Every structure is written in C-alpha cells, then in structure tokens.
UniProtKB/Swiss-Prot annotation:
It comes from the Eukaryota. It catalyses: a quinone + NADH + H(+) = a quinol + NAD(+); a quinone + NADPH + H(+) = a quinol + NADP(+). This is Probable NADPH:quinone oxidoreductase 1. InterPro entries: Flavoprotein-like_sf, FMN_Rdtase-like_dom, NAD(P)H-dep_reductase. It holds the Pfam family FMN_red. It comes from Oryza sativa subsp. japonica. Its cofactor is FMN. It is an enzyme of class 1 (oxidoreductase). Keywords: Flavoprotein, FMN, NAD, NADP, Oxidoreductase. GO terms for molecular function: FMN binding; NADH:ubiquinone reductase (non-electrogenic) activity; NADPH dehydrogenase (quinone) activity. The enzyme apparently serves as a quinone reductase in connection with conjugation reactions of hydroquinones involved in detoxification pathways. Its EC number is 1.6.5.2. Belongs to the SsuE family.
C-alpha cells in the first residue's frame, strides 16, 4: 500500500496593521505562528513587516511600472503567500493606516492579493476591533480576497482577566485555542480553493 501523499505546506503571510512594538494584534499573530509550529502540520505562519513601506504615492512608481525597493520586496512576499492572516486593529471604527497602505501598495499594477484566501483576527477595546474587520472585508471585495466567514475572533483586550502581557504577548489559553480554530478553518479553505485536499 502506498504511503499517503504528504500535504503541501501552506504559507500564511501574517500582516499586522499596527506598528506598535507591544501591539496586541501583533501578539495574536505571534501566537498564531506558535500554534502552527506546535499543533498544525502543513501550515506555516510567516510575519510580513509593513513598517518600512512608504506612504502610497504613485509619483514613487517608475515609468516602467516599477516600485521602490521596500514595496517590491513586500509585493514579492504577498505573491509568494498561499493565504493571509491579518491582525487588524481598529482606529476610528475602521482599518489602521499602515494596513490600508500595505493593501494599496500590493494592489497597484498587478493585484498581488487576487484570488487568495484570508482570515482576520483583532484585539482592542469596545468590540475588540470587529468594525475594522468589516471594513477590511469590504476592501477585500475589490482586491478579490476570499475571507473565511467562521470562526470570527475579535478579542476585547481590556476586559479582565488580562489577555496579554506588558510586551503584547497573548497569555490567554482560551483565545489561543480560538486562534487554532481560525487557522484550521483557513487551512481547510485554502486547500479547497487550491483543490489540493
């Protein structure tokens, strides 16, 4: 009997919309990477740093359609990813500027986001960043991103007991398990869209 073929490794580009060092949204993404290493074979989460991207300005594009080096490097990482995990903080009921800037740069010219699966996690006050998730989904329609619908994860970061330590690392085991469920859903959805399962 032949051994079962190994599942391909799905590369998840984790993009945090907050640039703050101790960002709770960054903490969710770090926890996601750890969960994958510990308990989800075939899924690898790689952090994609957006802090070096210039503000979108089409004057920075070259006549032949090129981009500044930091933008080219970012676009390459987006193209190489099989799917995305966004850590989306909420500012003024919407998406944070750094995340919107990254989305815009990778959509210029050839849309690097097109036809790829994605999931969103968020942490914050009030609704835990839930409103930013809905705005990100709206932007994703134009970008042709395919978001998983369930499960949703919007962490009310300031409610007791504490969910994060002073460095922004997730310390809540229940939320860690919920992240695992998001990742398993993203993995299954990605395999389905790629027709690899």
């Amino acid at each position: 009997m032949e051994a079962a073929a190994a599942r391909p490794v799905i590369r998840v580009a984790a993009i945090c919309g907050s640039l703050r060092k101790a960002s709770y949204n960054g903490g969710l993404l770090r926890a996601a990477a750890g969960v994958c290493e510990e308990s989800i074979p075939g899924l690898r989460v790689d952090h994609v740093d957006i802090s070096g991207l210039p503000l979108l300005n089409t004057d920075l594009e070259t006549a032949d359609g090129g981009f500044p080096p930091a933008v080219e490097a970012f676009r390459d990482k987006v193209r190489q990813a099989d799917c995305f995990l966004f850590g989306s903080p909420e500012y003024n009921y919407s998406i944070a500027t750094p995340l919107k800037n990254a989305l815009d740069w990778a959509s210029r010219g050839q849309n690097c986001w097109a036809d790829k699966p994605a999931a969103i996690v968020s942490a914050g006050g009030g609704f835990g960043g839930g409103r930013s998730q809905y705005h990100l989904r709206q932007v994703g329609v134009f970008l042709d991103l395919h978001f998983i619908n369930k499960p949703e994860l919007a962490v009310k970061a300031f409610e007791q007991p504490p969910k994060f330590d002073s460095d922004g690392n997730l310390i809540d085991a229940q939320i860690r398990e919920r992240i695992k469920q998001v990742l398993l859903s993203l993995q299954a959805f990605t395999l389905r869209l790629q027709k690899k399962d």
